[in-house]
């Protein structure tokens, strides 16, 4: 298994699919990385040379991925919560942030039902 951006990439899959195992790299970004690195997106990782894997590492390093991206997202959410704006309050209460209804549904965000206390 090749290791790119601190993630073990599966050897037996196409390069584009394997790169999506990195947090912050989707299909479009993976195709862009392959094009910039000059690597065939349909080639499997095990068939690539060490030089090609190094160029992929260099191209992935240009993007914000893994720990840095997770930290950025968490800092932005924390900033909203500190501001006390509507979106921050919704994050703090564990409710849907983007205007979805909560009378019914929203179970994923709210968690399991709590029994009514008397």
Curated annotation (Swiss-Prot):
Residues 92-118 are annotated as: Disordered. The keyword Translocase does not apply. Pfam families: Ribosomal_S13. SUPFAM superfamilies: S13-like H2TH domain. Gene3D superfamilies: 1.10.8.50, 30s ribosomal protein s13, domain 2. The keyword tRNA-binding applies. Keywords: Ribonucleoprotein, Ribosomal protein, RNA-binding, rRNA-binding, tRNA-binding. GO terms for biological process: translation. Part of the 30S ribosomal subunit. Forms a loose heterodimer with protein S19. Forms two bridges to the 50S subunit in the 70S ribosome. HAMAP family: Ribosomal_uS13. Located at the top of the head of the 30S subunit, it contacts several helices of the 16S rRNA. In the 70S ribosome it contacts the 23S rRNA (bridge B1a) and protein L5 of the 50S subunit (bridge B1b), connecting the 2 subunits; these bridges are implicated in subunit movement. Contacts the tRNAs in the A and P-sites. Belongs to the universal ribosomal protein uS13 family. PANTHER family: 30S RIBOSOMAL PROTEIN S13/40S RIBOSOMAL PROTEIN S18, SMALL RIBOSOMAL SUBUNIT PROTEIN US13M. NCBIfam families: uS13_bact (TIGR03631). This is Small ribosomal subunit protein uS13. It comes from Pseudomonas putida (strain W619). The gene is rpsM.
